[in-house]
């Protein structure tokens, strides 16, 4: 096989591997104590991560004790929001939400997957086989 064909084949396999969307744990925005983690496929431009939502102290929160709970849960996070802090208001309560991202499929759960995606494994194996045949 000529080197141009090898390059095209390798590029196609690598493109397929990189085009895969991440699989992440998600709680559907629910608090961590009621989370039934499900595995979802994140959208284009999203990564696995965690959301940490904490209320900011105020006099209104003293009247609403349930609003003083902090929440930590896994979710898909837009890549451009990774490692950012946002201030959000819900009714009379103001929350600080920190969005942290991690790398790899299912990296935001208690049991993370360390298996190599099949497309990458196939690309490396094919390239090694093609190069050894020359």
Swiss-Prot record:
Entry's localization field: Cell membrane
Any single Gene Ontology cellular-component annotation: synapse
Sugar attachment sites: 68
Signal peptide, first to last residue: 1-19
Disulfide links within the chain: 24-48, 27-35, 42-76, 82-101, 102-107
Keywords on record: Cell membrane, Disulfide bond, Glycoprotein, GPI-anchor, Lipoprotein, Membrane, Signal
Lipidation sites (GPI-anchor amidated asparagine): 108
Biological process terms in GO annotation: acetylcholine receptor signaling pathway
Residues of the propeptide: 109-134
SUPFAM superfamilies for the chain: Snake toxin-like
Domain UPAR/Ly6, chain residue ranges per copy: 22-121
Parts forming coiled coils: none
Post-translational modification: O-glycosylated.
Topological category with respect to the lipid bilayer: Lipid-anchor; GPI-anchor
Top-rank lineage group of the source organism: Eukaryota
CDD domains reported in the protein's UniProt record: TFP_LU_ECD_Ly6G6d
Gene Ontology terms, MF aspect: acetylcholine receptor inhibitor activity; identical protein binding
Subunit structure: Homodimer.
Name used for this protein in its record: Lymphocyte antigen 6 complex locus protein G6d
């Amino acid at each position: 096989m000529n080197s141009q064909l090898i390059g095209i084949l390798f590029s196609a396999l690598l493109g397929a591997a990189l085009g895969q969307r991440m699989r992440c744990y998600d709680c559907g925005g629910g608090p961590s104590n009621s989370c039934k983690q499900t595995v979802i496929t994140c959208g284009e431009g999203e990564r696995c991560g965690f959301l940490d939502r904490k209320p900011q102290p105020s006099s209104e929160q003293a009247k609403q004790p349930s609003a003083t709970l902090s929440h930590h849960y896994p979710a898909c996070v837009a890549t451009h929001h990774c490692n950012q802090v946002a201030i959000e208001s819900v009714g009379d309560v103001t929350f600080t939400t920190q969005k942290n991202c991690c790398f790899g499929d299912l990296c935001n759960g208690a049991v993370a997957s360390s298996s190599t995606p099949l497309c990458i494994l196939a690309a490396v194996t094919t390239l090694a086989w093609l190069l050894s045949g020359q």
